[in-house]
Amino acid sequence: MINLRKTHPLMKIINHSFIDLPAPSNISAWWNFGSLLGICLMIQILTGFFLAMHYTSDTLTAFTSVAHICRDVNYGWLLRNLHANGASMFFMCLFLHVGLGIYYGSYLYKETWNIGVILLLTVMATAFVGYVLPWGQMSFWGATVITNLLSAIPYIGTTLAEWIWGGFAVDKATLTRFFAFHFILPFIIVALAIVHLLFLHETGSNNPSGINPDSDKIPFHPYYTIKDALGAVLLLLVLLLLALFSPDSLGDPDNFSPANPLNTPPHIKPEWYFLFAYAILRSIPNKLGGVLALLASILILLIIPLLHTANQRSMMFRPVSQTLFWILTADLITLTWIGGQPVEQPFIIIGQLASMLYFLLILVLMPLAGMFENYMLKPKW
C-alpha cells in the first residue's frame, strides 16, 4: 500500500517538516520554544478573531465595547484575559528563543536568523498597535508618546507622524487604522514563520554542542512531538493560571480609565516586554539620539553573526562567553526594571549605565571573549 503521508502533495510537506524530519538526538528543552511560539500565535489569532467580532474601533465606543466583551459576551472575559496574557507568554517565549540563538550560536544560520529578527520586529509592532485598541489612558498616551518619536526624524518627521495619525494628533483615524494593522499583521507573521521554518529546514537544527549532528539524527516524530507536547501543556498551564487567577497583574491600572487627551498619567510606560527598549530610549537626553538607540537595541541582533569571533559555535564549552551572556541577561532584566521606574535619580544613572553595558557587551566584550578563548585553546608548547 502507498503511504499517503509520503506521496500526497500537501501531506508530504507536513511529513518532511514535522514527522520524518531528521533532528539532532541531543537538542534540549531550549529547542521547545519554536513550537511554543507557534502555539502562542495560534492562540492569539483565535482569541483575537473572536474578540474582533465584538470590538468597535471608534474612539467613542472602543472602551465600552471592551467592557461589553468582558461583561456581556459569553466567555468574553476569558477571551480577553487569554489574549492579553497570551501576548506576555508570546514575548516570554520570544526572548528565551532569541537567548537560545545567541547562547548556542544558532545565528550562524544567517537567513533563518535574519527572518527571525524581522519576525521579532513584526510581533513588536503588532503588540504595540494592539495595546492601543482598548482606548484606555495608557493605550492613548502610549500611542501618543511612541508615534511622536517619528517627529524626531529630520525634515520629514512631523509630516510622517501626522500621516501615521491621520490628523494632527492620535484620534479616531489612528485607532481605526491601528485596528486594521492589528488584524492583518498576525497573518504576515504566519507567512514569515513559514519562511523562517523553510530556511531552518535547509540546514537542519543546530544542537547544544554546536558540532555538525548529521552522524546522529533521529526522526522528529515521536521523539520531539511528545517533547513539544509536554512543553505545550506547561505553557498552557502557566497561561491559564495567569489568565484565570491574576489576569490584570501584568497590565497597567491606568488602562481601566477611558482615554482622556486632557489628563496625562503621572508615569507613561509601555507593557513589560517593551520596558528594556523604553529604558534605552529614555537613557539618552536627546530625542533623535534616543530614537536611534531604541532602533539599535533591536537591530543590533542583525549584526551578531558578523561579531562571532570564536572557533567554536556554541557557548557550551566557553566559560568566559557564558559569563558575559549571563551578565547580558541580568543587564536586560535591570533595563526592564528601570523602564518601569519614574525619571529621577538614581534610576536615570542606572538606566544610562545599563544601556551602555548592553551595547558594550554585544559590540566589544563578547567578540573579545571569543578571541581570548581561541587564544587559550591554542597549544602553547
Curated annotation (Swiss-Prot):
Keyword Transmembrane helix attributed: yes
Named cofactor requirement(s): heme b
Localization (cell): Mitochondrion inner membrane
Gene Ontology biological process terms in this record: mitochondrial electron transport, ubiquinol to cytochrome c
InterPro entries per record: Cyt_b/b6_C, Cyt_b/b6_C_sf, Cyt_b/b6_N, Cytb/b6-like_sf, Cytochrome_b, Cytochrome_b_C_euk/bac, Cytochrome_b_N_euk/bac, Di-haem_cyt_TM
UniProt: heme b b562 binding residues: H83, H182
SUPFAM superfamilies: a domain/subunit of cytochrome bc1 complex (Ubiquinol-cytochrome c reductase), Transmembrane di-heme cytochromes
GO CC list: mitochondrial inner membrane; respiratory chain complex III
Cofactor note as given: Binds 2 heme b groups non-covalently.
Keyword Ribosomal protein in record: no
Amino acids binding heme b b566: H97, H196
Membrane topology of the entry: Multi-pass membrane protein
GO molecular function, one term: ubiquinol-cytochrome-c reductase activity
Segments traversing the membrane: 33-53, 77-98, 113-133, 178-198, 226-246, 288-308, 320-340, 347-367
Family: Belongs to the cytochrome b family.
Free-text function comment from the UniProt entry: Component of the ubiquinol-cytochrome c reductase complex (complex III or cytochrome b-c1 complex) that is part of the mitochondrial respiratory chain. The b-c1 complex mediates electron transfer from ubiquinol to cytochrome c. Contributes to the generation of a proton gradient across the mitochondrial membrane that is then used for ATP synthesis.
Subunit structure: The cytochrome bc1 complex contains 11 subunits: 3 respiratory subunits (MT-CYB, CYC1 and UQCRFS1), 2 core proteins (UQCRC1 and UQCRC2) and 6 low-molecular weight proteins (UQCRH/QCR6, UQCRB/QCR7, UQCRQ/QCR8, UQCR10/QCR9, UQCR11/QCR10 and a cleavage product of UQCRFS1). This cytochrome bc1 complex then forms a dimer.
Additional record remark: Heme 1 (or BL or b562) is low-potential and absorbs at about 562 nm, and heme 2 (or BH or b566) is high-potential and absorbs at about 566 nm.
Protein known as: Cytochrome b
Lineage of the species this protein comes from: Eukaryota, Metazoa, Chordata, Craniata, Vertebrata
Originating gene: MT-CYB
